[in-house]
Amino acid sequence: MNDRADFVVPDITTRKNVGLSHDANDFTLPQPLDRYSAEDHATWATLYQRQCKLLPGRACDEFMEGLERLEVDADRVPDFNKLNQKLMAATGWKIVAVPGLIPDDVFFEHLANRRFPVTWWLREPHQLDYLQEPDVFHDLFGHVPLLINPVFADYLEAYGKGGVKAKALGALPMLARLYWYTVEFGLINTPAGMRIYGAGILSSKSESIYCLDSASPNRVGFDLMRIMNTRYRIDTFQKTYFVIDSFKQLFDATAPDFAPLYLQLADAQPWGAGDVAPDDLVLNAGDRQGWADTEDV
């Protein structure tokens, strides 16, 4: 999701999409399978194998089950059409290829109709450990396996429908924070301990370790209003992770009309990314070691 008012297409997106065209309305395009080089497939295999070695015991069971049920290719960039056969049969979702970041209204419309936009291109070998823009590994490996879980699938559809309303109400920054702290960087309590479900973590080797093992970040119980009023970081590891108890809790929290909540928060001073609020359910208070002093989003 892009929550910037000044939507700008990153240079790498422009370069990767030379010679391709997308639909002017929904930004989709046929997945250009012939564009993937042997180097691309090798890069995918490296990323996939690295995360699959690391994530057992760290990722939530629902993610690992989804990865297995979808039979995501380990040695090459997957064919979206083949994945869609299994995904649509499970929850009615499908993935659609897009050139990169897309405008918010288009993004919300896709989610509201059970279509998940996946950037078609892959990062380059020197970008294995960091890429600011989402690529096919982040979008597909990180996000798509959980779409086979019916409760999470319903949550993401509801989020898309809420996004259309939020944009009309000028409340997009609040809803963007909810996406960031759940879909991208969420943790979940399980009987076996705290686990990862956020795609931004699941697709990152270093943050998969940091979010659970480091003493630096705060880990705080899920609170909808708190999250929608909390800034975040896009350039470093997160200072705070919000922890849900179940995907049902996440879905139930988004069921009410958000319009009154937006009004309540309209004049509220947002919490900083590393702040601990008086009413927080603090599971782990971070020691703040290594935190960058630059501004939050």
UniProtKB/Swiss-Prot annotation:
<feature type="binding site">
    <location>
        <position position="143"/>
    </location>
    <ligand>
        <name>Fe cation</name>
    </ligand>
</feature>
<dbReference type="Pfam" id="PF00351">
    <property type="entry name" value="Biopterin_H"/>
</dbReference>
<keyword id="KW-0503">Monooxygenase</keyword>
<dbReference type="InterPro" id="IPR019774">
    <property type="entry name" value="Aromatic-AA_hydroxylase_C"/>
</dbReference>
<keyword id="KW-0408">Iron</keyword>
<keyword id="KW-0479">Metal-binding</keyword>
<feature type="binding site">
    <location>
        <position position="138"/>
    </location>
    <ligand>
        <name>Fe cation</name>
    </ligand>
</feature>
<dbReference type="InterPro" id="IPR036329">
    <property type="entry name" value="Aro-AA_hydroxylase_C_sf"/>
</dbReference>
<dbReference type="GO" id="GO:0006559">
    <property type="term" value="P:L-phenylalanine catabolic process"/>
</dbReference>
<feature type="binding site">
    <location>
        <position position="184"/>
    </location>
    <ligand>
        <name>Fe cation</name>
    </ligand>
</feature>
<dbReference type="InterPro" id="IPR018301">
    <property type="entry name" value="ArAA_hydroxylase_Fe/CU_BS"/>
</dbReference>
<keyword id="KW-0585">Phenylalanine catabolism</keyword>
<dbReference type="GO" id="GO:0004505">
    <property type="term" value="F:phenylalanine 4-monooxygenase activity"/>
</dbReference>
<protein>
    <recommendedName>
        <fullName>Phenylalanine-4-hydroxylase</fullName>
        <ecNumber>1.14.16.1</ecNumber>
    </recommendedName>
</protein>
<dbReference type="InterPro" id="IPR036951">
    <property type="entry name" value="ArAA_hydroxylase_sf"/>
</dbReference>
<dbReference type="GO" id="GO:0005506">
    <property type="term" value="F:iron ion binding"/>
</dbReference>
<comment type="pathway">
    <text>Amino-acid degradation; L-phenylalanine degradation; acetoacetate and fumarate from L-phenylalanine: step 1/6.</text>
</comment>
<dbReference type="InterPro" id="IPR005960">
    <property type="entry name" value="Phe-4-hydroxylase_mono"/>
</dbReference>
<dbReference type="InterPro" id="IPR001273">
    <property type="entry name" value="ArAA_hydroxylase"/>
</dbReference>
<comment type="similarity">
    <text>Belongs to the biopterin-dependent aromatic amino acid hydroxylase family.</text>
</comment>
<keyword id="KW-0560">Oxidoreductase</keyword>
<comment type="subunit">
    <text>Monomer.</text>
</comment>
